[in-house]
Amino acid sequence: MPKYRSATTTHGRNMAGARALWRATGMTDADFGKPIIAVVNSFTQFVPGHVHLRDLGKLVAEQIEAAGGVAKEFNTIAVDDGIAMGHGGMLYSLPSRELIADSVEYMVNAHCADAMVCISNCDKITPGMLMASLRLNIPVIFVSGGPMEAGKTKLSDQIIKLDLVDAMIQGADPKVSDSQSDQVERSACPTCGSCSGMFTANSMNCLTEALGLSQPGNGSLLATHADRKQLFLNAGKRIVELTKRYYEQDDESALPRNIASKAAFENAMTLDIAMGGSTNTVLHLLAAAQEAEIDFTMSDIDKLSRKVPQLCKVAPSTQKYHMEDVHRAGGVIGILGELDRAGLLNRDVKNVLGLTLPQTLEQYDIIVTQDDAVKNMFRAGPAGIRTTQAFSQDCRWDTLDDDRSNGCIRSLEHAYSKDGGLAVLYGNFAENGCIVKTAGVDDSILKFTGPAKVYESQDDAVEAILGGKVVAGDVVVIRYEGPKGGPGMQEMLYPTSFLKSMGLGKACALITDGRFSGGTSGLSIGHVSPEAASGGSIGLIEDGDLIAIDIPNRGIQLQVSDAELAARREAQEARGNKAWTPKNRERQVSFALRAYASLATSADKGAVRDKSKLGG
């Protein structure tokens, strides 16, 4: 039977110094036999998705201590991708994922904590904490800060829903007046919480439900709603139960690697495809699987993408629905219920509540549950009041959205598309694959061929788009923006948003070895692997080369002969130490980013660090 990790620092005469320090934090003799549980918070005033988390760690800690544990809180960093977008700050976003994972490992192992409650929310924070949890493999529960309410404003005598992306598009559209742009900006992000669409943050918080590491409702229940408080209270109580199950009963089913099994990873990816989640989730699930030592690859994702339909369509793929609407329709469990009825899920999985998938669906799927309290929870809705306070309102929808024919969540028979919301494409410059969010691609451009316009930085591409140098029919190629080449694999939300601003959203394609924001839609193909900086053939594309994209057949092809590509590769290699680096790009790269780049792998590996370079 395993002993508490914390006993290393709390037991034995030789640990008198450690106990003296523990006493200085408020611990007493009675605490030294209890499990020490880390409350891993991520409060910051920089990020609306985290601005309301300051007091929530204390809320969880109180429940831990009431249940017989000792709670110790610490904080991680948190980068706001939206604020970091469009300038050098975006170089730091993806690398922050590794820093978060490492910082959690450092704190938990340095102090021998027995278990964790992870209070996450936004883009790299949930993935970083997830990676750490699976690396450490001690009992854990995730509880996120929750989604923002959708923005709403009146334009042309009609109330419309808004989010961050609308503010970006209208701000760059020369046809939009200053007053309208200002109105949209002021209305787009009305409350605390992660941005209101199915962007990266909300996608990842939904996936923790499918992985079994968070409670039902975690991905969709609004940050502002009073009902969300119960998730935090439950997490504090439940983590003590899980911890004692493992350490006192030798029950390894309480460990995250046994909950988030390969079957659970497949379910999570199935959910992601069905709900049209962010392409970034592919990157993060691949990275998390490696930490869990699970053989889950792009090949697995490709197989799933060919059989899973799209059952949910949410902003940015449509402005009709946001996360508040997904919640009203039953949230993640509602989508999983439809996938289960379609025979597309692994049923032999459990969650942190100890429930199997069938048990979870029986209790929490609004289509089948008899539990009025559950139905009431899914009626939790927005208040439409600007606030940065968690749990500040208790508004409810009059009815649930249980219409599986025409509602937010659809049944298999009434799917938005028989093809899912994400697809993996392969071709002669994406030998290891690339990713497209098909949920955001107009049917008219699922097949697209056009001449390449090549840029070696996001900045140059933005200048060209706004300067009118990109025209209908072009394929914009942005390279040397991968994990190593950027470094940091910048998100390309500004280029895709500006294409829409210029009226080219359905008339152009964009291909990159970088990545896209969860707010991106359009024919936007990212994660091209291998990346240019690693010798990938995307580095051989020249202006005017024809590129053919065939999403239905999962293909992407540079229409240049093998002989010509071989000649170009030879010329590239002849550049010596300048080979596979961008030409005429001036970019200040800090030592910290260079250190990240030296170990970074391409996107098909999750952009994790190359362990082989460290003898791992």
Swiss-Prot record:
HAMAP family: IlvD (MF_00012). One of its GO terms (molecular function) is magnesium ion binding. SUPFAM superfamilies: IlvD/EDD N-terminal domain-like (SSF143975), LeuD/IlvD-like (SSF52016). [2Fe-2S] cluster binds at C122, C195. PANTHER family: D-XYLONATE DEHYDRATASE, D-XYLONATE DEHYDRATASE YAGF-RELATED. The active site is at S517. It is an enzyme of class 4 (lyase). It comes from Escherichia coli O81 (strain ED1a). The modification N6-carboxylysine is found at K124. Functions in the biosynthesis of branched-chain amino acids. Catalyzes the dehydration of (2R,3R)-2,3-dihydroxy-3-methylpentanoate (2,3-dihydroxy-3-methylvalerate) into 2-oxo-3-methylpentanoate (2-oxo-3-methylvalerate) and of (2R)-2,3-dihydroxy-3-methylbutanoate (2,3-dihydroxyisovalerate) into 2-oxo-3-methylbutanoate (2-oxoisovalerate), the penultimate precursor to L-isoleucine and L-valine, respectively. This is Dihydroxy-acid dehydratase. Pfam families: ILV_EDD_C, ILVD_EDD_N. One of its GO terms (biological process) is L-valine biosynthetic process. Belongs to the IlvD/Edd family. GO terms for cellular component: cytosol. It comes from the Bacteria. Pathway: Amino-acid biosynthesis; L-isoleucine biosynthesis; L-isoleucine from 2-oxobutanoate: step 3/4; Amino-acid biosynthesis; L-valine biosynthesis; L-valine from pyruvate: step 3/4. Its EC number is 4.2.1.9. Its cofactor is [2Fe-2S] cluster; Mg(2+). Binds 1 [2Fe-2S] cluster per subunit. This cluster acts as a Lewis acid cofactor. It catalyses: (2R)-2,3-dihydroxy-3-methylbutanoate = 3-methyl-2-oxobutanoate + H2O; (2R,3R)-2,3-dihydroxy-3-methylpentanoate = (S)-3-methyl-2-oxopentanoate + H2O. InterPro entries: Dihydro-acid_dehy_C, DihydroxyA_deHydtase, DiOHA_6PGluconate_deHydtase_CS, ILV_EDD_C, ILV_EDD_N, IlvD/EDD_N.
